[in-house]
A protein has these predicted regions:
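N-terminus-centered regions that define maturation/targeting leaders and the start
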Residues: 2, 8, 17, 21-182
Length: 182
């Protein structure tokens, strides 16, 4: 019992320390050296890179379909992160899905794959936080990460803890960017 508590305290202390040093929260730092060879597409993003309003706060508020290919053969699980790197608080994370099975190649709108879990977003709620750009178009990034292990996190994990675990386990990634008009 004491060992488990000590491990939790050590892990959380590390996360707090890294957060204070600016190492967690910066997609650039987390992705340094990770190959960008996964292809990411969405039927819900136009060829011009515009995501339909159905996936924003003034629409249905569900997430769009995301498809990917070319994950490495040694992938143990996958994660999808949606963020806005230009938000006043960066990165603002709208959605994290993790422990997606390695054979899975898509997420359908409103349907999380069996066995996958969602973390909290930057707003503090579990699941997808639909974007709501106030006065100008924003660019959102859907990044698919191939992970070398499954994450040992519960559903509803803290956004920084989930982001840190994904960054540490990432072996490859791919990205789709989408604009949402106000």
């Amino acid at each position: 019992m004491r060992r488990a508590t000590a491990r939790r305290v050590a892990l959380l202390s590390g996360v707090v320390l890294l957060s204070g040093c600016g190492l967690i929260g910066s997609p650039k730092n987390a992705q340094a050296g990770v190959p960008n060879n996964i292809t990411v597409t969405s039927p819900d993003v136009t060829p011009q890179g515009v995501m339909g309003s159905a996936y924003a706060c003034h629409g249905a508020g569900t997430y769009p379909g995301i498809h990917w290919s070319n994950a490495p053969a040694n992938t143990k699980s996958l994660a999808v992160v949606m963020d806005d790197s230009a938000a006043p608080i960066t990165p603002y994370i709208y959605w994290i899905v993790f422990d997606i099975g390695p054979q899975t190649t898509s997420i359908q709108p409103g349907q999380i794959p069996a066995g996958a879990r969602q973390a909290r977003n930057s707003k503090g709620s579990v699941g997808y936080d639909p974007p709501c750009p106030a006065d100008q178009s924003h660019t959102y990034r859907f990044t698919v990460y191939a992970l070398g292990s499954r994450l040992r996190l519960q559903a509803g994990a803290n956004v920084k803890l989930a982001w840190s675990a994904i960054a540490q386990a990432a072996i490859a990634r791919g990205r789709l960017t989408a604009n949402v008009p106000p």
